[in-house]
A protein has these predicted regions:
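C-terminal catalytic histidine-bearing segment of alpha/beta-hydrolase fold enzymes
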Residues: 353-416
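N-terminal cap/lid segment of alpha/beta-hydrolase-fold proteins
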Residues: 36-41, 46, 52-58, 72-75, ...
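Mobile cap/lid helix-loop segments that gate and shape the active-site cleft of serine hydrolases
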Residues: 281-316
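Alpha/beta-hydrolase active-site loop
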Residues: 229-250, 271, 408
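Alpha/beta-hydrolase fold nucleophile elbow
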Residues: 251-263
């Protein structure tokens, strides 16, 4: 190589190197993540704002959390910073990402697992009777470089909330009882019933309700040792035992409880409001049914009362004495819960029930219309006892919007 060729090559290296340095200088090297509530209940929205960016700069904001099995979930959105170098997640719509429209909590509900279809996955952090909170890590990345990070804590249990596991041998029922801080104002207890999945579910809901001041019992009624293996021949009296136990707790209104039933649990909730109005003073029905269906998955009778099968007919409402709130999705593919919710309201009207009753129908949501918001959830489940995935209908975005709108209305219903 001659001197002239060597000089030309050196010049090219200098130019390329200088160009890379100039390119790096055009991007932000640090940013600030401002969060109004870095520690908050899991059902509470947080307001996230990223500042210190260059004007109009492309930036990716991501969320990451680990479920109870240690699997990582992630959401992300790419934005163009505004003229002041700010991205406000409440007001900024992503250019691309795991959600589409401006949504301050989009990074939370849109998270998906590292592998697999997010429509078939449900984010499940540690249960609140085992882990009182979980963490979400937010990061800001520009041109492939992480320039800011912050960890948020999402709590299930407010300060002072306690929980106790109930057993058949000791308490006559199986479940987990969550109680508000001692000395809290007496409020209506909430009895929480899951659907055909069985076991003791809805513990997240119970913990959050107790954190809002409502004694809450997540009750198992089949699929628990000592109880029926499947949803068949479940005595309504079992629920009454649980309701009486709940209303006797410190901080609970002794006049009665509200039963909150999801899917098949909504049948039991409405039957209890009709059959035991002295104990059940209201009902919240998620993705409800207005008719008694057979047992699941093997048929037979789902419910009994006084030892006799509850007839498989439309659920009567003539003795309902308390308020009823039904929440349904218009795209429910399990059953037509929106139409069924409306029929329940019509029957209450026809029966001249004077207590408040309302159906909230979210047209684009599915069977996953409830309950509390901001936890990543899929739109299909594997049916109990089978390996068959079943679509619940709706979309993740529509279900998330329904929960975000519906949960405050549930809390207002309980407070009324």
């Amino acid at each position: 190589m001659g001197l002239r060729d060597w000089f030309v090559g050196l010049t090219a290296v200098v130019i390329v190197g200088g160009g890379a340095a100039a390119c790096a200088a055009r991007h932000s090297t640090h940013a600030t993540i401002d969060v109004d509530a870095p520690v908050a209940l899991a059902d509470q929205p947080v307001h996230v704002r990223v500042s210190g960016l260059r004007a109009r700069e492309d930036v990716t904001v991501a969320s990451q959390a680990a479920d109870a099995k240690g699997q990582l979930w992630r959401g992300e959105a790419t934005f163009a910073a505004d003229g002041d170098g700010v991205v406000d997640l409440d007001r900024s719509a992503p250019v691309s990402g795991t959600y589409g429209d401006a949504d301050g909590m989009g990074l939370f509900w849109s998270m998906g697992p590292a592998t697999g279809d997010p429509d078939e996955a449900w984010f499940s952090p540690g249960y609140p009777d085992a882990a009182g909170a979980f963490e979400v890590r937010l990061t800001v990345t520009v041109a492939g470089r992480e320039i800011a990070a912050r960890t948020l804590t999402r709590q299930w249990n407010a300060t002072g909330v306690t929980h106790r596991t109930l057993t058949l041998d000791v308490d006559g029922v199986a479940g987990v009882l969550f109680l508000p801080s001692p000395g809290a104002v007496r409020r209506t207890g909430v009895l929480l019933l899951g659907g055909s999945e069985g076991g003791v579910g809805r513990k997240y809901d119970a913990a959050l309700l107790a954190s809002h001041g409502y004694p809450a019992l997540a009750l198992g009624y089949f699929g628990v040792p000592g109880l029926p293996e499947t949803l068949r021949d479940i005595p309504l009296e079992y629920f009454v035992t649980a309701a009486r136990l709940l209303r006797a707790q410190p901080g609970a209104d002794p006049r009665g409880v509200v039963v909150n039933g999801y899917s098949r649990g909504s049948e039991a909730a409405l039957l209890l409001a009709e059959s035991y109005p002295d104990v059940v003073r209201g009902a919240i029905l998620y993705a409800p049914n207005d008719t008694v269906w057979p047992g699941f998955p093997n048929g037979g009778n789902a419910w009994t009362i006084d030892g006799a099968p509850v007839p498989r007919t439309a659920i009567p409402v003539t003795h309902v004495a308390g308020p009823v709130l039904a929440i349904a999705g218009g795209k429910d593919r399990v059953w037509p819960s929106a139409a069924q919710a409306q029929r329940i309201m019509q029957r209450l009207d026809d029966a001249h029930v004077t207590a408040a009753h309302q159906a909230l129908v979210y047209p684009d949501a599915g069977h996953g219309v409830g309950s509390f918001p901001y936890l990543a959830a899929g739109t299909s489940v594997t049916s109990p006892g089978t390996d068959v995935a079943r679509s619940l209908g709706g979309t993740r975005e529509a279900d998330a919007a329904a929960r975000s709108d519906g949960w405050p209305k549930v809390l207002a219903f309980l407070a009324a």
